[in-house]
Swiss-Prot record:
A zinc finger (HIT-type) spans 4-36. Zn(2+) 1 binds at C4, C7, C24, C28. GO terms for cellular component: cytosol; nucleus; pre-snoRNP complex. One of its GO terms (molecular function) is zinc ion binding. CDD domains: zf-HIT_ZNHIT2-3. The keyword Lipoprotein does not apply. Zn(2+) 2 binds at C16, C19, H32, C36. The lineage of its organism: Eukaryota, Fungi, Dikarya, Ascomycota, Taphrinomycotina. Pfam families: zf-HIT. It comes from Schizosaccharomyces pombe (strain 972 / ATCC 24843). InterPro entries: BCD1, Znf_HIT. Keywords: Metal-binding, Zinc, Zinc-finger. Gene3D superfamilies: 3.30.60.190. This is Uncharacterized zinc-finger protein C4F10.19c. The keyword Protein biosynthesis does not apply.
Length: 154
């Protein structure tokens, strides 16, 4: 036997049609009705006394939150100009890109996509890079070479 969540005395006989909260009688339903509300934006119902507000995630040390919502990379997470130059000038990386026409085409598309994006975090570009890493072995090899060089000099 499950007792009513409002009066804690009688057995449950009914459930709220809006949120399925169990109650036993009309007086308990009236008490519950004052605490039950429908949220109109997505037609969901909540019970005021039960749900806790969602807390935002803890910020990562490498992410700066602007207005509490828009992340951008912290300066220390970005590669230095000298590191970028050494990666671009690396003979093995240059050779891999120049010897693979498809890879050269992908790199040009990614550069163009990055130039078109606005904001501090190029989400479309990052998504495109991830897709290429998943579906293109040559691109994965290039990404691995760049990351090895990046972490070797960090």
């Amino acid at each position: 036997m499950t007792t009513c969540s409002i009066c804690n005395e009688s057995e449950i006989k009914y459930k709220c049609p809006k949120c399925s909260f169990p109650y036993c009688s009309l007086p308990c339903w009236k008490i519950h009705q004052s605490q039950c509300e429908t949220v109109n934006d997505n037609n969901t119902t909540t019970f005021k006394g039960v749900k806790e507000p969602l807390n935002p995630p803890e910020p990562s040390p490498n992410v700066i939150y602007v207005n509490g919502r828009i992340p951008s990379l912290a300066e220390e997470a970005l590669p230095s100009e000298s590191l970028l130059e050494s990666i671009v000038e690396d003979p093995s990386i240059k050779n891999l890109i120049e010897s693979n026409a498809e890879l050269l085409h992908i790199m040009k598309e990614l550069v163009n996509l990055d130039r078109e994006e606005e904001g501090s975090v190029p989400l479309k570009t990052l998504d495109a890079i991830q897709q290429q890493r998943l579906h293109n072995p040559s691109f994965e090899k290039l990404a691995s070479m760049i990351l090895e060089k990046y972490y070797a000099q960090k």
